[in-house]
Amino acid sequence: MPGLDDIRRAVSKLLKRSGPYENIVNEFIRDLQRALISADVNVRLVFNLTKRIRERALKEQPPPGLSRREWLVKLTYDELVKLFGGEYEPEVKPPYTPYVIMMVGVQGSGKTTTVGKLAKFYRGMGYRVGVVAADTYRPGAYEQLKQLADRAGAMFYGEPGSKDPVGIARRGVEELKQRGADIVIVDTAGRHGYGEEEALLDEMKRIAEAIKPDEVVLVIDAAMGQKSYDLAKRFHEATPVGSIIVTKMDGTAKGGGALSAVAATGARIKFIGTGEDIDEIEVFRPKRFVARLLGMGDLESLLEKIERLRGVEEFEKTVAEMMSGKITFRTIYKQLQQVTKLGPFRKILQMIPGISTMLESLDEAARLSEEKVKKWLTIMNSMTYEELDNPNLLEERSRVKRIAVGAGVEPSEVRELYNYYKSVKKMMRQLKKRKDLLERFARLGGV
């Protein structure tokens, strides 16, 4: 995540620094301040937070088993969790059915796309979901939501050409309930600028009165940064907002500012959008989020995602092989097959403890595309059993040339796969070295 990635780099630098401890603390505090301010976090919040970290790091003795640097990381973890909302677990499972969710937000926040993502998320949990296209303001909103509903496997209701958003919302909720929907998600219009915001808030009130939603969800673009504070308060005053979704966290340096600003209002962030694909939405849990920021990883989120797929046991077996250091091309083959189902490899790696701090030095080979994965699978299909079991045989040029001819690729592409194998093996070796540190953090309740 742009901006916030600098926090991970600050921690990585901290763990490598040498010299007097007070100097190390001061340098880390400066790096952390720069990272948070560049992420558009309120300057006053940043200086208060870093002041508390510095004072405790220099005055308090770390618990038995932790070095002073590790204690500094733990203090940073605790303060960032507070900054981004504290220790709470959002309840995403509806308390009863049918359950009506009304989506609100300004135009351009990614609201309609988020309706599709939510529909897909709840379909994945086994609920029957329906969506209502009540945005009559934006051209193309009806067609966009219809396509998203199809992709999500959700029921759809809309009235193309109608200019009566309140009536559409009321009739849509009634019909989808009759069709057996457990969850009904209503998309409403957004507006640009302060001049049109009053009209938006008035329409929002009228729709809420007509459909009596069980939950109102405010969608906020992460690029708003600190401005999210005022927006969240204005919407909440118009219609009580039950939860908030912060979108486009992958595309802006201001994500930290948006998250901290929303948390400062006391509102609960339930989900964050992490990409453009319909699957790229995740439950926002401050503790896990901060653990990933610091490079500690988020195994629980990763495991949740894996559980929604087939072949969980096979995946776990592959991960165990990789963690043990016994990596061959057979391991890489299985890993590439499975990761294509999970999403971009770098996003998966960021969830694994210890790996995210290494991504900066990871070879370009690890930046996988779907096209590259297919090509590499073809290359491995052209290898002998001996080569699959002993990748170092590819040091021989004659083997590289033979494999390239068999796969219909250039020798340089075979060497690229070999370099990828070496970078993964190196990464796993580094990860094993950090295992003790992670276990000690876990015992302290940090992750």
From Swiss-Prot:
A GO term, aspect molecular function: GTPase activity
The organism's place on the tree of life at top rank: Archaea
UniProt record similarity statement: Belongs to the GTP-binding SRP family. SRP54 subfamily.
Residues reported in the UniProt entry to bind GTP: 105-112, 187-191, 247-250
Keywords: Cytoplasm, GTP-binding, Hydrolase, Nucleotide-binding, Ribonucleoprotein, RNA-binding, Signal recognition particle
Subunit structure: Part of the signal recognition particle protein translocation system, which is composed of SRP and FtsY. Archaeal SRP consists of a 7S RNA molecule of 300 nucleotides and two protein subunits: SRP54 and SRP19.
GO biological process terms, semicolon-separated: SRP-dependent cotranslational protein targeting to membrane
Record function comment: Involved in targeting and insertion of nascent membrane proteins into the cytoplasmic membrane. Binds to the hydrophobic signal sequence of the ribosome-nascent chain (RNC) as it emerges from the ribosomes. The SRP-RNC complex is then targeted to the cytoplasmic membrane where it interacts with the SRP receptor FtsY.
Domain-level remarks: Composed of three domains: the N-terminal N domain, which is responsible for interactions with the ribosome, the central G domain, which binds GTP, and the C-terminal M domain, which binds the RNA and the signal sequence of the RNC.
A Gene Ontology term for the protein's cellular component: signal recognition particle
The name this protein goes by in its record: Signal recognition particle 54 kDa protein
Main localization, broad class: cytoplasm
Organism lineage: Archaea, Thermoproteota, Thermoprotei, Desulfurococcales, Pyrodictiaceae
Subcellular location: Cytoplasm
SUPFAM superfamilies for the chain: Domain of the SRP/SRP receptor G-proteins (SSF47364), P-loop containing nucleoside triphosphate hydrolases (SSF52540), Signal peptide-binding domain (SSF47446)
Origin species: Hyperthermus butylicus (strain DSM 5456 / JCM 9403 / PLM1-5)
Catalytic activity: GTP + H2O = GDP + phosphate + H(+)
EC number from the UniProt entry: 3.6.5.4
Pfam family name, one: SRP54
